[in-house]
Amino acid sequence: MPLSDTQKTQIRDGFAHLRESLQPASLAFYEAFFRRRPDLRPMFRDDLAGQGMRFMATLGLVVDALDTPEELAERLAELGRGHAALGVKAEHFAPMGEALIDTLQAQLGAEFTPEAEAAWRAAYAEVARQLVASGQLA
């Protein structure tokens, strides 16, 4: 991911703060997502707590691999293929990204500066790009 060292630090610091309240943050994330796309709710299991924690675990993998994107690429390729099998489309990633930004704003408060937001947006855009490409999502 073409992120500066400052951006990587902002992402790591933000995720460290988010780790303090992962369960509520993960639920807030899916609430924000389904506010944007209620039509997609049937694609998800009833266990949103578990789904949310899986999302946060994946987010943690991304954060941990900021300096080694080649290691992350294999995992993202696998995830992209899995998402394709579930019927996920490329268009689903934009509202998910906005839900992530909403969640970070709510959880991090003043820590979530415009610069931190730009860093998170850049990282998410690259992850989404890789997922879409590897899953050949339409």
Language-model segments: residues:
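Globin-like tetrapyrrole-binding proteins
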Residues: 1-138
